[in-house]
């Protein structure tokens, strides 16, 4: 595979993208930093097909990224391959306003092949290619220039090996008849709503034991205010105000802006500046939530009770058995919420009860719940047996 020098000029990038536009697939990775910002700062993009690979410097002065943007988000004839691509996709969506499509994620593929629950890239490379990757540049400040040879070698290895891994994983999936298993997971991965932080929904991430409509209304307004401030100023939301501070303000709202100086966790200057004024406006304009807007407590665990918790343990044992038999990661078949939903009788839209998941696990899970199957020990091994009707 040809490895190009770091691309910093528009003509070289355009020529590369023109060649890659004829590929069946491209492997993609990004390097970024986000410790001190709300939005991740894109510092490097690595890209490869089965013939060539390059790292692209998005921080290079005057670099026209249009050809790369077109390749990533406007060309749907090329499959885009990532490993654990959630953060890469978030960055691409933020910078281009669109999602790459179609997608393939090698971490999810590895789960479907029973390699591991969330296998890391280096472990996957070592398993399939017998190559041990150098991890020395993992904690690089990718925004610092110039990047040295070791940093660039580390970065480019993220796509050169990925381009080799992808055909191997795809063939194994097809040989095992699992090519379609990933469709639902890839659709979820490509859903832009997975990566967009809606200020109006940000309050739902904050733990709040109080269920009063007026308090929750203030919390919603405060969380939206914080999210917008963080986005506009491009700083982490926690540096605006901690969750606990917002919860306290929602329960004990200050009467005047000058009272903000007494609130622990807020800057004293907010008692008289524009930020404090916007915070007070959020509190004053907050509306109590309507009954239907108040999230229901997670009563599922209470609903299923202690026996339900033990039934969940039995279902998890069954899941572990069937995942082992099928050589697929249990987490890809069913999550705890899916299992609790089965026990609580919530069977509509449960992914476990459709398609291949139903065949591997869901069918027997329902039979176990309905008393039609039971665990038994046969020749020292746990097995499932049908219960014959009297």
From Swiss-Prot:
Task: State the compartments where it is located.
Answer: Cytoplasm
Keywords for the protein's UniProt record, in alphabetical order? Cytoplasm, Exonuclease, Hydrolase, Nuclease, tRNA processing
Task: Tell me, in one coarse class, where this protein mainly resides.
Answer: cytoplasm
Q: What is its EC number?
A: 3.1.13.5
Specify whether Amino-acid biosynthesis is a keyword of the entry. Answer: no
A Gene Ontology biological process annotation? tRNA 3'-end processing
Q: Which PANTHER family match?
A: RIBONUCLEASE D
Q: What is this protein called?
A: Ribonuclease D
The organism's taxonomy opens as: Bacteria, Pseudomonadati, Pseudomonadota, Alphaproteobacteria, Sphingomonadales
């Amino acid at each position: 595979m040809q490895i190009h020098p770091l691309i910093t000029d528009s003509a070289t990038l355009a020529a590369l993208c023109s060649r890659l536009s004829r590929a069946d697939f491209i492997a993609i990775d990004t390097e970024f930093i986000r410790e001190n910002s709300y939005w991740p700062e894109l510092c490097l993009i690595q890209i490869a097909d089965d013939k060539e690979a390059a790292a692209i410097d998005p921080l290079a002065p005057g670099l026209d990224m249009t050809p790369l943007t077109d390749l990533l988000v406007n060309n749907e004839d090329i499959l885009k391959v990532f490993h654990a691509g959630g953060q890469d996709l978030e960055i691409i969506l933020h910078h281009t306003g669109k999602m790459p499509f179609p997608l393939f994620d090698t971490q999810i593929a590895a789960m479907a092949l029973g390699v591991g629950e969330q296998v890391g890239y280096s472990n996957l490379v070592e398993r399939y290619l017998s190559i041990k990757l150098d991890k020395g540049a993992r904690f690089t400040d990718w925004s610092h220039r110039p990047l040295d040879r070791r940093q660039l070698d580390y970065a480019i290895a993220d796509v050169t090996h990925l381009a080799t891994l992808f055909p191997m994983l795809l063939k194994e999936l097809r040989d095992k008849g699992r090519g379609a298993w990933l469709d639902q997971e890839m659709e979820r991965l490509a859903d832009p709503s997975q990566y967009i932080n809606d200020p109006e929904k940000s309050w739902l991430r904050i733990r709040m034991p109080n269920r009063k409509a007026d308090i929750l209304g203030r919390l919603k307004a405060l969380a939206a205010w914080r999210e917008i401030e963080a986005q506009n100023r491009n700083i982490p939301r926690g540096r605006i105000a901690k969750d606990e501070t917002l919860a306290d303000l929602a329960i004990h709202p200050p009467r005047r802006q000058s009272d903000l100086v007494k609130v622990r966790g807020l800057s004293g200057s907010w008692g008289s500046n524009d930020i404090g004024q916007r915070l007070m406006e959020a509190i004053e304009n907050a509306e109590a939530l309507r009954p239907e807007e108040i999230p229901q407590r997670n009563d599922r665990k209470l609903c299923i009770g202690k026996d339900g918790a033990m039934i969940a343990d039995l279902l998890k044992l069954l899941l572990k058995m069937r995942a082992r038999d099928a050589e697929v990661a249990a987490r890809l078949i069913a999550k705890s919420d899916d299992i609790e939903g089965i026990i609580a009788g919530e069977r509509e839209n449960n992914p476990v009860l459709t398609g291949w998941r139903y065949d591997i696990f869901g069918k027997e899970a329902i039979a176990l719940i309905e008393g039609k199957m039971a665990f038994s020990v046969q020749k020292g091994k746990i097995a499932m047996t049908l219960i014959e009707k009297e």
